[in-house]
Amino acid sequence: MFRLLKRACSFLLLFVIYQSFVIHHNVQRVLAYKPMVEKTLAENDTKANVDLVLAMIYTETKGGEADVMQSSESSSGQKNSITDSQASIEHGVNLLSHNLALAEEAGVDSWTAVQAYNFGTAYIDYIAKHGGQNTVDLATTYSKTVVAPSLGNTSGQTYFYYHPLALISGGKLYKNGGNIYYSREVHFNLYLIELMSLF
């Protein structure tokens, strides 16, 4: 029994070390975009900041694709139509800045603006009419009743989403319903990047 426990602990330790290495590698890849993000923000009148944009890049692609902010769909309506990282960041920052301005105007929290990056700007009005604060419950309802049906999922079909923040809340997402945990993942990744930047 002790030998089995020892093996399990060794395996767990190796897994944690490996995951730490992967996360550190991904963070360094994202941080390589920092000068580009700083330049783009300096050229825009925006409430967005460097750390938030980098956390969104980490959440979207971990810096591993040309369209680092997954800006194509909001730009052209088609996936992967942006093939240049600078263009992706410029469009992503413009959209985020627009969302932050709308959120301030509507009197809702800034994390609603971040969630709207995933759900679309109409989410800001939805939150304004439902308490002014982005929550997982409101995001879930909006995903199920607005986003998913608009993209063809009228039956409420779900799938399992393997992310620690999702697992805490049951781990399901609605097919074609966006990511109800998006703003929380970005928030978590802010701290993750900050932590990994120390090493």
Swiss-Prot record:
What InterPro entries does this protein map onto?
A: CwlT-like_lysozyme (IPR047194), Lysozyme-like_dom_sf (IPR023346)
Kindly report the protein's main subcellular placement as a broad class.
Answer: other
UniProt cross-references to Pfam families, sorted A to Z: Lysozyme_like
Q: Where would you find this protein in the cell?
A: Cell surface
Q: Could you state one GO cellular component term attached to this entry? A: cell surface
Instruction: State what protein this is by name.
Output: Pneumococcal vaccine antigen A homolog
Species whose genome carries this gene? Streptococcus pyogenes serotype M18 (strain MGAS8232)
The UniProt gene name for this protein comes to pvaA
